[in-house]
């Protein structure tokens, strides 16, 4: 039935060759337009049918025809601030046979506005400008402009003037409308969209999304944006469907109004960029009792900026609670030059979650367009599958030139006719497009490219309370004489100007986030009021304009004031070393980090100062040399007290008494709150492996749990049960009640699973439970091993030896006694790595003893029971554990599905099992891990 309706409709519109014919065809349907307006602070609606629109446009076309000086080549520039006026006068110009150009909203800066108006006057060959009387002052009295207000036209035009409606004679290849680009990279360009191009595009959209006659369309974006014109207005026309229009201000003041209108009009198709989806999500979650019937909704198109998968996932869940039947969020790619959206995903967020994507895939092309990715390093060559490169498009829906701008046209196309979009992306194995930022929004620091989009998302994902979301801009800056670009971050502060603590904390978190990803701190960090960060109608901020303002000195006074406040606050909170132990710790850090003593605050985290997991042990050695009298410093003292002052106090305490065992190691104690993350050690029992991961959570408390046995007089655990009870108890001492977030790495996955069961049995919620690359069934991996095998695995895990060496040396090592075996491993192993870890035979033996104790405790272990939630993170397995990653995931890790009440989520991660949390892979792993946590709501 549906197929026959579609075919009949396709045949009825297939003969249309221009937009005037399209409106005439639609006038014979029952469809029409509903316009909302606010009068006396009351929102009211008016409906006009397509037949009425045709008649009204015909009358207005007669009025345009009476303007003196018009020719068949004249351009009519339309500048209105309501959707109804733009639509009515657009069709008037179209029916009359003139070329309409739709003006964009003007900027407040009068100097820039004047330059823009004069540029358009020249570029569009002295167009006739139509506007409303109330908007005439916006044109600054420029005498050059051929300006007409429509109220005067209506009152002065002859009543009996005749006009030939030349619009119906237009050919498919004739230009139908000029759409203006945002001008984000300079002066606005005019994009000619042809009649046939537009008709092909809207039919391609309809085919791709399965829209049908009778589907209701809803728009809240100005008609100056190509998505409003093509995605909604013309798309609805070609189906003879109703379309609803409201001003953006109605929704931005109350995003629930969007959902109410979808319900009221039983909307099937609408549009919203990511920033507005976030507003809708927040409103729905803040109003859980809000009801709506959204069962008619088929497609919620989203474009203009990258869609965050977590947002799409959470919003999809909220929409389903209100009647939506399927996945309706359709992230897409489009430009003015491609008649708006022309590449869309139809499987968001499920596809993106399966692929562990942070930003939603953009799917495939509509009929009428093709895409390709070209290599950046080898110009003219196609990029390999999955390789990031330059996105280029071609096809009937793509424009072929910029109006009156030969230079821009020449630079926009390849020799073989493909349009260079300026975007970076890759096409995955399923043929779906994924974007990686704009070529001009790329920052190159010391030869390494970084995407502004990714850095901005990383900053905002930390949910920094001190900044306003969606107003963060990262741009390159290059000081005179600098050998490389540097990173500048501009943000809009949410804190009060006099809240110096919030200002300082916000700057610290932003700086740390950027540093973790790029290895360098922002060279410039500037808090700007929102009024200085202008957004387009789709919520985009022009990076090039921000950079130009930054480098021209427009922000200089704000930047200087901010730097002065931060310097004063740092001085205020700086605490010098006072005791002998504090001075010893400070001296050790000065020598170790090569920083001045005045740069070391006794209350700052040593990790913020630059200490990493790899050099933590070397710091301990340096510190032991500085102390007088000499004492042995357990690593736990540094791990448990990660500030210089706390380390000094702990040293003083340890001189007089023996510290008791504490499993909890604070890796990141942050004031901003958030659900703490508890990380449970692998088989070695130590927690250094989590230090790098913790650094990627600048606004979340992170704790690791170490085993018993590393400290003096600490007895090893006697059983798994004792271990689990101890860990659960100590976790609750830090966080008395859930929701909890717990992760176990390698063999620690077993402990994490058992701890989660204990907490859930106590009535607590474990909202996020992670098994980092280890299966539920472990007994068969360990029961036939002995201490020597454990030593080999520890040496491999610590990267003293590689897997090939581990296999080759196994028979020989089993013939040696304990001390000889330990010595042999260090003799054949990586000596530099051993020095970095401060590993000698004694310490290597201790680690092996602890791991062997763990092996003995779990050699008869059988997993039982179920937890509520589970995420499994997958790396390449050791060869002794599985044939390959597929075998590891499906046949080993896949068994976790038997031990969870709900669906287990699997996440592919970079690297091999033993190195997946190392420096080379930690950024990629943290990205996947944090996305999984966000999807679980922690």
Curated annotation (Swiss-Prot):
Annotated region (Thiolation and peptide carrier (T) domain), positions in chain: 581-652
Disulfide cross-links: none
Stretches the record annotates as Thioesterase (TE) domain: 676-923
EC number annotated for this UniProt entry: 2.3.1.-
Renumbered residue ranges of the record's region Adenylation (A) domain: 44-445
Biological process (GO), any one: (-)-microperfuranone biosynthetic process
SUPFAM superfamilies xrefs: Acetyl-CoA synthetase-like, ACP-like, alpha/beta-Hydrolases
Annotated function: Microperfuranone synthase is the only protein required for the biosynthesis of the secondary metabolite microperfuranone from phenylpyruvic acid (PPA). Several steps for the microperfuranione biosynthesis have been proposed. These steps include the activation of PPA, by the micA adenylation (A) domain to AMP-phenylpyruvic acid followed by loading of the PPA unit to the thiolation and peptide carrier (T) domain and eventually transferring to the thioesterase (TE) domain.
Top EC class for this record: transferase
UniProt-listed InterPro entries: AB_hydrolase_fold, ACP-like_sf, AMP-bd_C_sf, AMP-binding_CS, AMP-dep_synth/lig_dom, ANL_N_sf, PKS_PP-bd, PKS_thioesterase
Record-stated family: Belongs to the ATP-dependent AMP-binding enzyme family.
PANTHER family found in the cross-reference section: LONG-CHAIN-FATTY-ACID--COA LIGASE, MALONATE--COA LIGASE ACSF3, MITOCHONDRIAL
Residue(s) carrying O-(pantetheine 4'-phosphoryl)serine: 613
Active site: 746
GO molecular function, one term: CoA-ligase activity
Species in which this protein is naturally found: Emericella nidulans (strain FGSC A4 / ATCC 38163 / CBS 112.46 / NRRL 194 / M139) (Aspergillus nidulans)
Name recorded for this polypeptide: Microperfuranone synthase
UniProtKB keywords: Phosphopantetheine, Phosphoprotein, Transferase
Carrier domain segment(s): 579-655
Pathway assigned in UniProt: Secondary metabolite biosynthesis
Gene3D superfamilies in the cross-refs: 3.30.300.30, ACP-like, alpha/beta hydrolase, N-terminal domain of ligase-like
The organism's place on the tree of life at top rank: Eukaryota
């Amino acid at each position: 039935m549906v197929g026959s309706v579609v075919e009949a409709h396709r045949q009825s519109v297939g003969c249309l060759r221009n937009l005037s014919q399209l409106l005439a065809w639609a006038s014979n349907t029952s469809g029409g337009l509903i316009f909302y307006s606010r009068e006396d602070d009351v929102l009211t609606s008016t409906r006009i049918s397509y037949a009425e629109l045709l008649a009204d446009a015909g009358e207005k076309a007669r009025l345009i025809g009476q303007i003196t000086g018009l020719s068949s080549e004249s351009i009519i520039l339309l500048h209105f601030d309501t959707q109804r006026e733009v639509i009515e006068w657009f069709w008037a110009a179209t029916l009359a046979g003139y070329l309409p150009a739709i003006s964009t909203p003007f900027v407040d800066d009068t100097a820039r506005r004047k330059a823009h108006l004069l540029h358009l006057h020249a570029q569009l060959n002295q167009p006739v400008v139509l506007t409303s009387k109330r908007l005439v002052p916006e044109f600054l009295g420029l005498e050059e402009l051929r300006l007409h207000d429509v109220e005067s036209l209506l009152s002065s035009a002859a009543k009996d003037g005749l006009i030939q409606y030349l619009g119906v004679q237009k050919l498919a290849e004739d230009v139908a409308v000029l759409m203006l680009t945002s001008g984000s990279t300079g002066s606005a360009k005019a994009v000619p969209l042809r009649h046939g191009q537009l008709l092909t595009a809207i039919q391609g959209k309809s085919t791709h999304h399965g829209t049908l006659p009778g589907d209701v369309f809803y728009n809240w974006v100005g008609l100056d944006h190509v998505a409003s014109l093509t995605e909604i207005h013309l798309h609805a026309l070609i189906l003879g469907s109703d379309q609803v229009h409201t001003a953006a201000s109605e929704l931005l003041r109350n995003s629930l109004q969007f959902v109410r209108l979808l319900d009221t009009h039983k909307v099937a198709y609408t549009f919203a960029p990511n920033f507005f989806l976030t507003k809708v999500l927040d409103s729905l979650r803040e109003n859980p009792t809000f009801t709506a019937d959204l069962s008619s909704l088929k497609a919620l198109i989203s474009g203009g900026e990258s869609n965050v998968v977590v947002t799409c996932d959470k919003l999809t869940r909220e929409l389903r609670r209100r009647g939506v039947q399927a996945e309706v969020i359709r992230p897409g790619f489009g430009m003015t030059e491609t008649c708006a959206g022309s590449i869309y995903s139809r499987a968001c967020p499920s596809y993106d979650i399966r692929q562990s994507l942070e930003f939603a895939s953009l799917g495939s092309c509509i009929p009428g367009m093709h895409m390709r990715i070209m290599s950046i390093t080898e110009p003219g060559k196609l990029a390999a599958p999955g390789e990031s490169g330059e996105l280029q498009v071609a096809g009937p829906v793509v424009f072929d030139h910029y109006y009156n701008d030969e230079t821009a046209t020449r630079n926009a196309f390849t020799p073989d006719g493909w349009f260079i979009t300026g975007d970076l992306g890759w096409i995955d194995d399923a043929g779906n497009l994924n974007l990686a930022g704009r070529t001009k929004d790329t920052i190159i620091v010391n030869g390494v490219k970084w995407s502004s989009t990714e850095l901005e998302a990383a900053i905002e994902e930390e949910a920094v309370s001190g900044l306003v979301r969606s107003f963060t801009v990262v741009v390159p800056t290059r000081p005179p004489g600098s050998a490389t670009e540097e990173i500048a971050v501009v943000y809009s502060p949410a804190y009060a100007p006099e809240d110096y603590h919030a200002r300082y904390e916000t700057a610290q978190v932003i700086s740390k986030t950027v540093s973790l990803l790029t290895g360098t701190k922002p060279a410039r960090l500037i808090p700007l009021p929102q009024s200085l960060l202008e957004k387009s109608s789709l919520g985009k901020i022009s990076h090039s304009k921000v950079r130009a303002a930054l480098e021209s000195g427009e922000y200089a006074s704000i930047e200087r004031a901010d730097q002065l406040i931060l310097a004063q606050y740092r001085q205020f909170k700086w605490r010098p070393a006072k005791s002998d132990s504090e001075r010893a710790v400070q001296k050790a850090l000065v020598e170790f980090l090569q920083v001045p003593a005045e740069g070391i605050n006794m209350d700052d985290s040593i990790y913020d100062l630059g200490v990493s997991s790899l050099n933590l042990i070397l710091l301990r050695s340096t510190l032991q040399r500085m102390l007088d009298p000499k004492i042995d410093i357990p690593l736990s003292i540094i791990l448990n007290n990660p500030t210089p002052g706390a380390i000094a106090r702990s040293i003083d305490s340890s001189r007089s008494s023996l510290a008791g065992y504490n499993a909890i190691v604070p890796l990141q104690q942050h004031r901003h709150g958030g659900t703490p993350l508890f990380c449970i050690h692998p088989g070695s029992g130590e927690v250094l492996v989590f230090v790098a991961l913790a650094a990627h959570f600048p606004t979340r408390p992170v704790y690791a749990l170490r085993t018993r046995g590393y400290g003096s007089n600490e007895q090893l655990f006697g059983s798994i049960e004792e271990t689990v009870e101890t860990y659960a108890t100590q976790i609750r001492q830090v966080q008395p009640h859930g929701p909890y977030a717990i992760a176990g790495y390698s063999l620690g996955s077993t402990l994490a699973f058992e701890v989660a069961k204990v907490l859930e049995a106590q009535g607590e919620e474990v909202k996020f439970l992670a098994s980092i690359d280890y299966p539920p069934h472990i007994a068969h991996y360990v029961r036939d091993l002995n201490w020597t095998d454990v030593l080999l695995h520890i040496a491999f895990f610590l990267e003293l030896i590689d897997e090939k060496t581990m296999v080759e040396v196994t028979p020989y090592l089993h013939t040696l006694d304990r001390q000889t075996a330990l010595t042999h491993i260090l003799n054949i192993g990586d000596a530099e790595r051993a020095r970095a870890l401060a590993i000698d035979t004694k310490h290597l033996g201790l680690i092996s003893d602890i791991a062997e104790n763990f092996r003995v405790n779990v050699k008869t272990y059988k997993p039982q029971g179920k937890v509520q939630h589970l995420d499994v993170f997958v790396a390449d397995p050791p060869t002794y554990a599985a044939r390959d990653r597929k075998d590891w995931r499906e046949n080993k890790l896949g068994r976790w599905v038997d031990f969870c009440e709900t669906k287990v989520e699997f996440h592919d991660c970079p690297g091999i099992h033993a190195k997946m949390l190392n420096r080379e892979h930690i950024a990629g792993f943290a990205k996947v891990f944090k996305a999984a946590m966000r999807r679980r709501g922690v």
